[in-house]
Design a protein with these regions (language model features):
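Donor nucleotide-sugar binding/catalytic pocket of nucleotide-sugar-dependent glycosyltransferases
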Residues: 68-116, 266
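Aromatic "clamp/platform" in nucleotide-sugar-dependent glycosyltransferases that forms part
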Residues: 224
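Short hydrophobic beta-strand element within catalytic cores of glycosyltransferases
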Residues: 241-244, 260-264
Length: 359
């Protein structure tokens, strides 16, 4: 009921603002920068979707309409700040370099940790399993994630849990996801390794259970780029070893004081594939990471053969994350960017004065 009430009030507020019947003091716009608007006295844009090494020109224009921009990783911040395009000076007709001028700050993502909650009727018959969590999409490099994993463990009694979907968690989506997975598996009819498809909505507690399951030994992710990499963060927070490329958003929480706390997969930066281009979001002339097949397989093998070492490193990372990326610290950092502490104290003092006058 509270959620419905809140959604109703948000919708009403948006309508009143666009009709110019309400002038809010501040707007926080959580969306892709294409949709940033100057609708209040102070406008803050908040976006997570920067997975390449260049943003679209429209993002620079829309970003400069904001008073502040918040992003979820240093990769996103650096990419946004370093992107330039050519624009025409309306007064002189001269071609000039155009870039973001708006201040941009990093506020890392976080989710509330829930206690483990078992997933009913989900039984693993293999004792050593890897986990991957992604959509079936070009950016996630899912086909190679699965194909190369099978080739590495084709004659081993090892499992891979594939938590995925194509677009949503409907029954039709399950059939489509299952068929796509079958197409990959048909190439390896004699494999001994096992693939488990996990589809549909899972609660936060069920995700925590996955990360802590005794039979799940590592999370793998060789996507081309991540704005932050929330599943990797959640898994690392629980002490699950991570296998990934050392590029894009996940490096913020997988590195500490120059040290890597994950199994590093080598990669090359190359132009994005044609099928991944999304005009105004993923630029055709931008690039992202392409994991090296041999390095990925070696990382899988090292984790399988030396799991105790991987677990020890993951345990150290868990401690670091609980100290430096805990929920309260990330929440405080986010609030500070919306309403700075000194301004909050000033508002509190004004409210206290008002209440004292009333009393």
């Amino acid at each position: 009921e509270f959620r419905e009430w809140m959604d109703e009030k948000i919708t009403l507020t948006q309508v009143l603002i666009h009709k110019k019947q309400l002038q809010a003091d501040i707007s926080l716009q959580i969306t892709i920068p294409n949709e940033f608007e100057k609708i209040c006295k102070t406008n803050i844009g908040y976006t997570a979707g920067i997975e390449t090494n260049k943003v679209a020109p429209i993002w620079l224009q829309k970003g400069n309409d904001m008073d502040k921009i918040l992003v979820v990783s240093n990769h996103a911040k650096t990419t946004y700040e370093n992107t330039t395009t050519m624009a025409t000076n309306n007064q002189t007709g001269e071609q000039v370099k155009y870039k973001l001028q708006t201040p941009i700050h990093v506020v890392h993502e976080c989710t509330v940790r829930s206690e483990p909650e078992p997933i009913e009727n989900f039984d693993l018959t293999t004792d050593f399993n890897f986990l991957t969590i992604s959509q079936f999409s070009p950016r996630k490099n899912f086909h190679n994630t699965i194909k190369w994993w099978i080739e590495e463990f084709i004659d081993q009694n090892v499992g891979l849990i594939v938590k995925t979907n194509l677009a949503n968690n409907s029954q039709m989506d399950w059939f489509a996801s299952n068929n796509m997975l079958k197409q990959i598996l048909e190439e390896y009819p004699d494999r001994k390794c096992k693939i488990y498809l996990l589809h549909g909505d899972l609660s936060s507690g069920q995700m925590t259970w996955l990360y802590n399951n005794d039979k799940i030994k590592s999370l793998i992710n060789i996507s081309h780029g991540e704005g932050f990499g929330l599943p990797m963060f959640e898994a690392a927070r629980e002490g699950l070893p991570i296998i990934t490329v050392g590029w894009s958003g996940q490096t913020d929480f997988l590195h500490y004081n120059g040290k890597k706390y994950f199994e590093d997969v080598k990669f090359n930066l190359q132009q994005v594939q044609k099928e991944a281009v999304w005009d105004g979001v993923i630029q055709q002339d931008s690039g992202w990471a392409f994991a090296d097949q041999g390095s990925y397989k070696m990382a899988l093998r090292k984790t399988y053969k030396n799991h105790d070492k991987s677990l020890k490193r993951a345990s150290k990372l868990k401690t670091l994350l609980n100290e430096n990326f805990n929920e309260q610290k990330l929440y405080d950092g986010f609030v500070e960017q919306i309403v700075p502490l000194q301004e909050m104290k000033k508002i509190d003092a004004e409210i206290d004065d008002l209440l004292s006058d009333l009393l």
